């Protein structure tokens, strides 16, 4: 994936304003609510019996923070997403057996959360750059599957 200087600027500019803990927890929580079959990867997370239980679950929030922190690595390494996510790709493929489609779904959740948090600042141009980034991360995470 090649990012233009403008795309990089738009992504890093917004990233500097992102609350990683809040956004990450909300993105993973939404993923688990909207796509309930993804819950099977999180059996150890305890109560996920309802949307409010999922959104308030401390383990969901903690994992969300971890996920979004790794997105920070993507922002810093846009020119080497495959290398940046090689170890995580291996973990999710070989050990956890996560369906790579879930990475795309999570990326879309992140874009939705950013749009809701940043409103008018999340212009179509900003969205286009972020969609490109989350798609690049999803592809990098799925790399070990091919």
Curated annotation (Swiss-Prot):
Keyword Transport: yes
GO biological process assignments: cellular oxidant detoxification; hydrogen peroxide catabolic process
Residue ranges occupied by any Globin domain in the UniProt entry: 2-146
Domain of life: Eukaryota
Positions with a binding annotation for heme b: 63, 92
Keywords assigned by UniProt, alphabetized: Heme, Iron, Metal-binding, Oxygen transport, Transport
PROSITE patterns reported in the protein's UniProt record: GLOBIN
GO cellular component term, pick one: haptoglobin-hemoglobin complex
UniProt xrefs under InterPro entries: Globin (IPR000971), Globin-like_sf (IPR009050), Globin/Proto (IPR012292), Hemoglobin_b (IPR002337), Hemoglobin_oxygen_transport (IPR050056)
UniProt GO MF annotations: heme binding; hemoglobin alpha binding; metal ion binding; oxygen binding; oxygen carrier activity
Pfam families listed in its UniProt record: Globin
PANTHER family membership: HEMOGLOBIN FAMILY MEMBER (PTHR11442), HEMOGLOBIN SUBUNIT EPSILON (PTHR11442:SF7)
Note: Hemoglobin theta chain is an embryonic beta-type chain.
Family, per entry: Belongs to the globin family.
Entry protein name: Hemoglobin subunit theta
Species for this entry: Sus scrofa
């Amino acid at each position: 994936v090649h990012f233009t200087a403008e795309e990089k600027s738009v992504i890093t500019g917004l990233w500097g304003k992102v609350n990683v803990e809040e956004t990450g927890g909300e993105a993973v929580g939404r993923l688990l609510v909207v796509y309930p079959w993804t819950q099977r990867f999180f059996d150890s997370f305890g109560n996920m019996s309802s949307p409010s239980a999922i959104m308030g679950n401390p383990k969901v929030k903690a994992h969300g923070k971890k996920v979004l922190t790794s997105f920070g690595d993507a922002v810093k390494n846009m020119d080497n997403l495959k290398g940046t996510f090689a170890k995580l790709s291996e973990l999710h493929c070989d050990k956890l057996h996560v369906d790579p489609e879930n990475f795309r779904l999570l990326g879309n959740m992140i874009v939705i959360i950013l749009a809701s948090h940043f409103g008018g600042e999340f212009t179509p141009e900003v969205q286009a750059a972020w969609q490109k980034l989350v798609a690049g991360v999803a592809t990098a995470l799925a790399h070990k599957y091919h």
